[in-house]
Amino acid sequence: MYFKRKAYDKLLEWKKLYSEKYAVLLEGARRVGKSTIAENFAKNEYRSYILIDFSKTTSNILECFDDIGNLNIFFLRLQAETGITLYEHESLIIFDEVQLFPKARQAIKHLVHDGRYSYLETGSLISIKKNVKDILIPSEEMKLEVYPMDYEEFCDATGNNYGLLQQIYDSGAAIGQATNRKLMRDLRIYMAVGGMPQAVEAYVNGKNFSEIDMVKRQIISLYEEDFKKIDASGRISALYHAIPAHLAKDARKYRITTAIGKRNNTKAEELLYELIDSKTVLPCYNSTNPRVSLTDTKDFDSYKLYLSDTGLFVTLMFIDRPVTENDIYAKLLSDKLPANLGYLYENLVAQMITVSGRELYYHTWEKKGSTHYYEVDFLISEESKINAFEVKSSGSGKHESIREFCRKFSQNISKAYLISQKDAGKEENLLLEPFYLLPFLIK
């Protein structure tokens, strides 16, 4: 089953504007749909294409790359081995899972300069040290990030009218409690299923939530296998599994030692960066002084980690049992889980901000005369100012942190939002918006 993906539109732009001078690399975590997008693009937009999947190709194909000094012979061998005819300026060559054969990635420089065909690569763990240590990274390569399906893509796949949300946002008015509850339930389905195409396909095909959960567990197992290939000790996997617990504690930052114990700091940091490079997690950095610049005041020692897919986050929350039962999902969909799930909604917001093309930032500072801290969950730049976001699963409470932030940085703030399950509204200078309208706030 193929779903409409935004990355496809970006590939169309690449083909029209850049394909003569650059290859394009679809980069992202495993199982986000890179290979499917690539092959559908090739089928629809080119006269012919050759797909080389380096996870299962033949030794004869690999031997073609031993000598690319004579590209005429190289292309003849490829056509002979695959039985596919290439047409100049009308054919695409796909290097799928290119991280498994770095020599092919290095060849991109010469292939692009040759100019006869277009080139598309897909890769996961593409930046991991062992996958790039012996090659020259080609400058003739444009990177295109592929994420799990966002809420708009999910609505398109499931037949929900995402355009209606745009109209609600444009109206600037509250929609009413009954409709708001319905729209929040729709969003919670997305949170429960997530955006991994295999999980979405299972949902579209009518599978129950326990069956969908098994699909997501298989993806997590695949990630764990990848982590062990990078570090056999299992510490990267421990860092990954610790994310829900860290967020549940409402800690001001992620602590590596809590997940893997006290180890060599340098080695632990290397493992952390390998985890981040896998694209399975989203780092959110503390901006020490939002007055100046979020990027320039990024504290690399103070950060939080979120999962790149909220559906996987739900499964990881209950990974201690053999399968997450339908009953748990039913309670999640009806908002009746006994736990405070503010951190689950935080992960949703982190994912939504990331797919908009932005980095994640938060801000925390000491409360005078107290051992407690204020914290604003997310900050984004808007021209020369910033927008601040506080995330609440319920919407009730004093919202002390964001109000104090507004006082402290009044000259630097454009808008301050409370994102919750409640309908749109306003409390003094605080704008109240439901989660399903967040994508329109950060466009």
Indicate residue ranges for each PLM-predicted region:
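Pre-Walker A adenine-sensing motif
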Residues: Y2-Y18
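A cross-kingdom feature that marks ATP-driven nucleic-acid transaction machinery
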Residues: K15-K16, Y22, R31, N40, ...
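Hydrophobic anchor at the beta1->P-loop junction of P-loop NTPases
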Residues: L26
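Conserved lysine of the Walker
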Residues: K34
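Short glycine-rich substrate-engagement loop in P-loop NTPases that contacts/grips substrate
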Residues: K56-H89
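Structural recognition of the conserved hydrophobic beta-strand(s) that form the central parallel beta-sheet
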Residues: I94, S118-S124, E145
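Short regulatory helix/loop adjacent to the ATP-binding pocket of P-loop NTPases
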Residues: H110, S127-K143, C155-N160
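Interdomain hinge/linker elements that couple catalytic modules in large macromolecular machines
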Residues: G159-Y345
